[in-house]
Amino acid sequence: MSEMTPREIVHELDAHIIGQQKAKRSVAVALRNRWRRMQLDADFRQEVTPKNILMIGPTGVGKTEIARRLAKLANAPFIKVEATKFTEVGYVGKEVEQIIRDLTDIAIKLTREQQMGKCRQRAEEHAEERILDALLPKPKNDWESTETDSSSNTRQVFRKKLREGQLDDKEIDIDVAQPQIGVEIMSPPGMEEMTNQLQSLFKNMGQAPAKRRKMKIKEAFKLLIEEEAAKLVNQEDLKEQAIEMVEQHGIVFLDEIDKICKRGETSGPDVSREGVQRDLLPLVEGCTVTTKHGMVKTDHILFIASGAFQMSKPSDLIPELQGRLPIRVELDALSADDFKRILTEPHASLTEQYIALMNTEGVKVEFSESGIDSIAKAAWQVNERTENIGARRLHTVMEKLMEDISYEASEKSGSAFVIDADYVSAHLDNLVQDEDLSRFIL
């Protein structure tokens, strides 16, 4: 897992997300606390439970982006899910326990990559021997089986050429394991164990024998390394480590949690809102979930929930779930200055993306300071007058602004454009000032 300090985590998030320091600090501390907990004695460690987070803020201010960037920094099993995708147990739709099953699958993949990385050197040696065997087949007759000095020397010559890349383009016939055909079975509620057993049965039935293929040595070497590394990984140890990783370091990001709040007085079962909240309770509090890899305890999994709460309030969540999300963080609405920073400061910012895209056609595009100010102001004004969709408004405004250049770029190779205040005014003023037009076009 990540050993980064909270300050380092915030610094990494700053490279991609403008503002929202409170939210960044909260997730940074939560991530660091995962590491701190693992430094404690085993007995005391069990008593330290994660403090789950609820992020509240309007749409388009960076809630989901924080989750995306955090996933890359965490170096731990991480899953982002939309709360609206789930229904109460017993009804058609996904059950919330599927979150933990998917998280376990992610952990299996992560652990497999780590273990295969550790035994990569041995896998390369085995792959090298298999390629040399294909290049220099061993004699089939028993009386010729003793390796002579000349054949040994020839093998060493070919080994040297192989390592230097001189044989990369040479084609060989080699036996390569066939990919397994997966069978997806939709399981009825409460019958996941039977479904897993059926899937295992089909998986074993569908194992095809190795197929002889003709390919270049460079391609064959990559395939054989993967194949040999997979053979060296102990599957039982892999499952144990993955489950341990989920239980101790797993992070679940629940997006759009405000959409499962109960709205007004409704009669009948609310299976996709309050029902989902009730099902989430044991998951967030701590329970045991059955997966095809084994039993997974959720007691120490960190849950980060987020929602815009425009049509509802955090207090509309059922009280038990509110209590299980003790840390509340409010994200601020974006100002015109924030828009300006979003256009220029982050790594691979929106302006940099358009400059790079047009450069592929031989067209040089430059954004002046006044142009960036005007774009930011236009996006902010449209947000204020119509629906506030946050930074996503910049994508709409920029696409409309660059529409003519993008369309004609292939015919204007070698030309240059400067996007200044006058250019922005000429292309956007009518749309921004006309509220009806901006509602439909921007």
From Swiss-Prot:
GO molecular function: ATP binding; ATP hydrolysis activity; peptidase activity; proteasome-activating activity
Major location category of this protein: cytoplasm
Keyword Glycosyltransferase: no
InterPro entries with a match to the protein in the record: AAA+_ATPase, ATP-dep_Clp_protease_ClpX, ATPase_AAA_core, Clp_ATPase_C, HslU, P-loop_NTPase
GO CC, alphabetical: HslUV protease complex
Residue positions binding ATP: I18, G60, V61, G62, K63, T64, E65, D255, E320, R392
Location within or outside the cell: Cytoplasm
Any single GO BP term: protein unfolding
Keywords for the protein's UniProt record, in alphabetical order: ATP-binding, Chaperone, Cytoplasm, Nucleotide-binding, Stress response
Record family assignment: Belongs to the ClpX chaperone family. HslU subfamily.
Protein's job: ATPase subunit of a proteasome-like degradation complex; this subunit has chaperone activity. The binding of ATP and its subsequent hydrolysis by HslU are essential for unfolding of protein substrates subsequently hydrolyzed by HslV. HslU recognizes the N-terminal part of its protein substrates and unfolds these before they are guided to HslV for hydrolysis.
Subunit annotation: A double ring-shaped homohexamer of HslV is capped on each side by a ring-shaped HslU homohexamer. The assembly of the HslU/HslV complex is dependent on binding of ATP.
Protein name: ATP-dependent protease ATPase subunit HslU
Organism: Shewanella baltica (strain OS185)
